[in-house]
Swiss-Prot record:
It catalyses: uridine(38/39/40) in tRNA = pseudouridine(38/39/40) in tRNA. The active site is at D52. The keyword Isomerase applies. GO terms for molecular function: RNA binding; tRNA pseudouridine(38-40) synthase activity. Gene3D superfamilies: Pseudouridine synthase I, catalytic domain, C-terminal subdomain, Pseudouridine synthase I, catalytic domain, N-terminal subdomain. This is tRNA pseudouridine synthase A. Formation of pseudouridine at positions 38, 39 and 40 in the anticodon stem and loop of transfer RNAs. Belongs to the tRNA pseudouridine synthase TruA family. GO terms for biological process: tRNA pseudouridine synthesis. Signal peptide: none annotated. It holds the Pfam family PseudoU_synth_1. It is an enzyme of class 5 (isomerase). Homodimer.
Amino acid sequence: MPRFRLDIEYDGSLFAGWQHQADQPSVQQAIEQAIEKFCGEAVRLRAAGRTDAGVHASAQVAHVDLAKPWPGDKVRDAVNAHLQAAGAHVAILKAAIVPDDFDARFSATGRHYLYRILNRRAPAALEKGKVWWVPKRLDAGAMHEAAKLLLGRHDFTTFRSTQCQANSPVRTLERLDVSRAGDMIEVRASARSFLHNQVRSMVGSLKRVGDGGWTEAELKAALEARDRAACGQVAPPDGLFLIGVDYP
């Protein structure tokens, strides 16, 4: 059976996350149902990142095995047609046959996330659901400097969910940048893999530095505590986007 790679974007606002949920809509389910309507096959997708409820993606990657070597453009267009008909806020950007040993999750060598903070007195209107609105002025420069403390290989127990199923809390954070453009603050994070809720936990703690609630030393102490209770506020899912996945 030929294996297809799917490049996907979606608005996570209306979904309970990527992964199948018993009684709530998921991105995975929406795409699998669209594929079944296209080719009559009940399939199971595997994705590079199992995003949480409310988290968006502009560059999610998944793979699926189909019975026929359909042209990639046909798969893309047909699945999109069924997604549109279902009213799902999901789009297949590209579909292509890949080697049988390609695995969207385990073949990935890097994942890239963007977190957007709307930092102004007025709430979000056009971007509601796509940003974290923080009305108090944040010092993005202080956030960026503090972020450097989290770079490299660390035990990120403080910054992972208590429900995280990863065998080890140790991860190597390759990038964590904070920048401001007008009222928008962007936090960009890159690593081979992330722990559950790690990016949102780091952003929430950096926000505490930005509003003067924490010093750099207090952020460092939180990291070194290796204690979930030491984490700052967990940023809401609205502002988080999976924006890239690397493969060899």
